């Protein structure tokens, strides 16, 4: 059995920044540091930060007064920001800047009283945060659609004053079809020059397609609640390549690889490389050879840290 590695894979700039914000806050201020929602959707990362003093909560009413709270990479609604400010909580915002970009778009449509459609998965924290940027008091409304069927049944007030945005971690292929359906049903709809799916999501989806084309089975390292990791598994399966989403080497079954010659490995944007290395080691113990990395798109994007953490870390 030969191992092939997708390129790029694993951490993106937004995830790197979010994890580093929690790490720096722990270093500068000491534990406990409260984090609203899992800072990124990865079990290994969350447990590591928890072991060092991060406390993960789902709502601010679980946060005591006079502590530091960090908003996760997925972003939060304006109502959550207002609640935190009203309580005087010290907040560090780990929202991915590419998610913030979508928030700004939604807020602009809201101010203009323009109806907005969000393409995304119901219940995902990024979707909840993005929906929560819209203030309907200006006369508009925001709607959530997941697929073409939702578009077909959607009723809006003013189809001539309509715009769309997208969740950043969707399948590019699925999203393209939904956008086409929106444009067909609402010809006057506006939106970003291109969809809001982030560069890292696009790159990892392109890479897993190449991987699935060259391999007999694909392993996606990522947690079950990771949207982008699930999309990677789905893409491989759509190419008729068996694919498995695993948190790490302990989730693998040796029987998956009977008769397999080429094993492909990728990782979601919130999965650290140490987990990939663990998977490789286990496969090699089962007789796999090599770990050849495919050619791929280079990523050199970085996002800046909050000023207070950036300055204090240098003192």
Curated annotation (Swiss-Prot):
[4Fe-4S] cluster binds at residues 12, 96, 198. One of its GO terms (molecular function) is 4-hydroxy-3-methylbut-2-enyl diphosphate reductase activity. Pathway: Isoprenoid biosynthesis; dimethylallyl diphosphate biosynthesis; dimethylallyl diphosphate from (2E)-4-hydroxy-3-methylbutenyl diphosphate: step 1/1; Isoprenoid biosynthesis; isopentenyl diphosphate biosynthesis via DXP pathway; isopentenyl diphosphate from 1-deoxy-D-xylulose 5-phosphate: step 6/6. Its cofactor is [4Fe-4S] cluster. InterPro entries: LytB/IspH. Dimethylallyl diphosphate binds at residues 41, 74, 124, 226-228, 270. Binds 1 [4Fe-4S] cluster per subunit. The active site is at 126 (proton donor). Its EC number is 1.17.7.4. It is an enzyme of class 1 (oxidoreductase). One of its GO terms (biological process) is isopentenyl diphosphate biosynthetic process, methylerythritol 4-phosphate pathway. Keywords: 4Fe-4S, Iron, Iron-sulfur, Isoprene biosynthesis, Metal-binding, Oxidoreductase. It holds the Pfam family LYTB. Isopentenyl diphosphate binds at residues 41, 74, 124, 226-228, 270. Catalyzes the conversion of 1-hydroxy-2-methyl-2-(E)-butenyl 4-diphosphate (HMBPP) into a mixture of isopentenyl diphosphate (IPP) and dimethylallyl diphosphate (DMAPP). Acts in the terminal step of the DOXP/MEP pathway for isoprenoid precursor biosynthesis. Belongs to the IspH family. This is 4-hydroxy-3-methylbut-2-enyl diphosphate reductase. The lineage of its organism: Bacteria, Pseudomonadati, Pseudomonadota, Gammaproteobacteria, Pseudomonadales.
